[in-house]
Design a protein with these regions (language model features):
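Short, well-structured beta-strand/strand-turn elements
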Residues: 39-50
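Conserved phosphate-interacting/catalytic interface
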Residues: 1-33, 42, 59-120
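Beta-rich nucleic-acid/ligand-interaction surfaces
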Residues: 50-58
């Protein structure tokens, strides 16, 4: 991958370094963003919710409907404490979205885990 800026090619490594200065988690978030977009989902920021993304179901329009998922991205090597897991669940519940945990491995492959509430 190269980026062209005013007809000047910028190597992939340099692009990544520039992006890392803007967002230290870009190597975790970008594979998730790319994967969801390739699957046809609309992906928007969820910064105001303290999450990485909000995702709209295929064919749904942001502004006309609510996002289906709120997404938190992490690397497979990162441990998730019960209090962090609970906090993520509270954010999803309070925003009326399903919680989607996106776990990125060493090869930048993404696994998703959807968390839903069960009424008993």
């Amino acid at each position: 991958m190269n980026l062209e800026l005013k007809e000047k090619k910028i190597p992939k490594k340099e692009v990544l370094n520039k992006l890392k200065r803007l967002d230290k988690r870009i190597q975790i978030k970008y594979p998730v963003f790319k994967n969801l977009r390739e699957k046809g989902y609309i992906v928007k920021t969820a910064l105001k919710f303290g999450a990485d993304f909000r995702v709209y179901d295929k064919g749904k329009k942001p502004g006309k409907t609510h996002a289906k998922w709120i997404v938190f991205c992490d690397h497979e090597s990162k441990r998730l404490s019960w209090s962090d897991f609970s906090a993520k669940n509270r954010v999803a519940h309070s925003t009326r979205k399903k919680l989607l945990l996106a776990i990125v491995d060493e090869e930048s492959d993404v696994s998703y885990y959807e968390v839903s509430w069960i009424k008993t």
